[in-house]
Design a protein with these regions (language model features):
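A membrane-periplasm/extracellular boundary helix in multi-pass inner-membrane enzymes
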Residues: 249, 253-254, 274-326, 347-348
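Loop-to-helix entry and N-terminal half of a specific, functionally important transmembrane alpha helix
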Residues: 390-394, 401-402, 414-455
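Alpha-helical transmembrane segments of multi-pass inner-membrane proteins
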Residues: 7, 40-45, 153-165, 170-199, ...
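N-terminal hydrophobic segments of proteins, predominantly signal-anchor/transmembrane helices
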Residues: 45-149, 153, 233-236, 445-451
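Helix-loop-helix junctions and helix-breaking kinks within/between transmembrane helices
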Residues: 21-33, 50, 70-81, 212-215, ...
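Membrane-interface helix-loop-helix junctions at transmembrane boundaries of multi-pass membrane enzymes
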Residues: 49-51, 93-111, 229-242, 275-278, ...
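Long extracytoplasmic/lumenal interhelical loops at the membrane interface
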Residues: 197, 201, 329-333, 337-403, ...
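Hydrophobic, aromatic-rich transmembrane alpha-helices
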Residues: 36-48, 84-98, 220-233, 406-429
Length: 515
């Protein structure tokens, strides 16, 4: 038996045994004991893949994103995987097994460097430490916290891992295709798990509360259909249209209005790429008119609770359930009140509006907050608690608080440039086979960034999801440019009248070919 085949059999058997042990621990709820097993399992799988170890960067995060693994979900899985793969790749490079390159794209590289450098300057201006290393000083307690700085370090590791490993366009599409398949499998598994644990589909729960077992399946289906097919292709196909409508209902049943906003932004973005934006706009107007008609006829009361809550954000649509409308209005007023506090200097929640207060928090203030909670004067759901801890439920306000207007300006410019190149590279890939899998991987940047600005945006989301997707988009731009598919941004062409061009063509055709 050849050595390579024997090695593959041994590693496969070890992976099977470890997978069985991991499944047993997960079913018993022993998530803490599951961590070392997962690490050993991942190490063997890393050795098995060899030069293809970079596949794990794309294929592992969807598993942890959809699976409910308690303790493991609190870890920055994507950054950990990137760090492990980067170290392993560099070791193979030192031993001469692989090569190292730089998947560079100057505009995005420069802006990413500026963004991360500004976060570093924020830490220098507002240093923080870990709580276990703090001590009482004459001026009070030290500033602690700043998890966002560790997330920024993770971003650098992920950025280097994606940039240093040679990746071709064909291999990238292949890996992203398998990543999508893994996401579909995990979505179906989690949907089945939610239904089994809940005793099947519960009409009572769907009519009285937010219902989310179908969200993963609906989201994956909707994203793929709009990435693969143009709007007219969906409308003219009955099964595609039914699948899109069913996906929208599954997403709406969660009751989160930002989920529907994410769907709308994603659909409009892909329709722009497919050059059918006007068709989608007309379709949305028709759907809006139909919803207004149903509202006037009092025919929306039979919809699930979550769907009715989502429709409270649609102009012209009236929901009869006062509990739903009252809760939605209270949610908006609750946020607006906190944002008013944040932008009022006399409230004292933000000290430096220009450069920001950094990501730390005074231990003295944390101590006061803890005492207030213990005495029953404050709870974790109070506005004052969120304001004291810097949780503003708005990416814009959070950016101003932590990095100031200067940091917010840098983030806005960075996001706009990323928007531009994501759309540009997507248009360049419009006729490439398998392009939909690239769309599925880079267009979440557009939707997540929009939600960061107008919804509960946090810097953890910015680092963990948004910056990671921006790094992947940069790699896609680099790979596409190396393949000569990226059109030049500025070209200088001298205008030549048509009559002269025809004369030149005739002369060149009549002249003998040069040897």
């Amino acid at each position: 038996m050849q050595g390579g085949a024997f090695r593959n059999i041994i590693i496969f058997l070890l992976l099977a045994v470890l997978a069985f042990v991991a499944g047993s621990l997960a079913s018993d709820g022993a998530q803490v004991a599951l961590l070392p097993v997962v690490l050993v399992l991942g190490s063997f799988f890393l050795l098995y893949l060899g030069r293809n170890c970079w596949w794990l960067i794309f294929m592992v995060p969807p598993v942890f994103a959809l699976a409910d693994l308690s303790v493991l979900n609190s870890f920055p899985i994507s950054f950990v995987i990137c760090g492990i793969v980067l170290v392993y790749w560099l070791l193979m490079y030192i031993m001469g097994y692989v090569k190292v390159t730089w998947n560079g794209f100057a505009p995005l590289d420069v802006l990413n460097f500026i963004l991360l450098t500004y976060f570093l300057s924020t830490w220098i201006a507002n240093p923080v430490t870990l709580q276990i290393f703090t001590s009482i000083t004459d001026e009070g307690y030290a500033d602690v916290g700043g998890k966002e700085y560790f997330w920024a370090i993770g971003c650098v590791v992920a950025y280097l891992a994606l940039s240093l490993i040679p990746i071709s366009l064909e291999s990238l599409i292949k890996v992203l295709k398998w990543t999508f398949i893994v996401s579909c499998i995990m979505a179906v598994i989690m949907c089945a798990k939610g239904l089994v644990l809940g005793g099947g589909y519960s009409t009572e729960l769907a009519e009285t509360t937010r219902y989310s077992p179908f969200y993963g399946v609906g989201s994956v289906s909707f994203d793929y259909l709009f990435a693969k097919f143009p709007v007219m292709g969906i409308v003219l196909s009955p099964w595609k249209l039914v699948l899109v409508l069913g996906s929208c209902m599954a997403i709406a049943m969660t009751g989160f209005r930002e989920n529907i906003l994410e769907v709308v932004v994603y659909a409009y973005s892909l329709s722009f790429i497919h050059r059918q934006l006007i068709i989608l706009l007309c379709g949305c107007v028709a759907v809006w008119g139909f919803l207004v008609y149903l509202s006037n006829e009092k025919m929306l009361d039979g919809l699930p609770y979550g769907a009715q809550r989502v429709l409270t954000a649609v102009p012209g649509v009236e929901i009869e359930n006062k509990e739903i409308t009252g809760g939605a209005e209270h949610s908006l007023e609750w946020r607006f009140e906190m944002w008013r506090w944040a932008m009022t200097p006399s409230e004292g929640y933000i000290k430096d509006y220009v450069w920001g207060d950094g990501f730390g928090q005074s231990m003295y203030q944390l101590r006061l907050t803890t005492i207030s909670m213990n005495r029953g004067k404050m709870s974790m759901g109070d506005q004052r608690f969120f304001a004291e801890t810097g949780v503003w439920h708005s990416g814009v306000i959070t950016a101003i608080h932590r990095t100031g207007f200067v940091g917010l300006t840098i983030i806005v410019v960075w996001s706009l440039v990323c928007f531009f190149y994501i759309f540009r590279v997507s248009i360049a890939l419009r006729h490439v086979k398998g392009r939909e899998f690239i769309y599925l991987s880079i267009f979440p940047f557009v939707t997540l960034m929009v939600l960061f600005y107008i919804s509960a945006g946090t810097f953890r989301k910015l680092f963990d999801d948004i910056f990671y997707t921006a790094a992947l988009a940069k790699v896609v731009c680099s790979v596409v440019a190396k393949n000569g598919l990226m059109p030049r941004m500025f070209t200088h062409q001298i205008y030549v009248p048509l009559i002269h061009r025809e004369a030149e063509d005739e002369e060149s055709a009549a002249s003998p070919a040069r040897s």
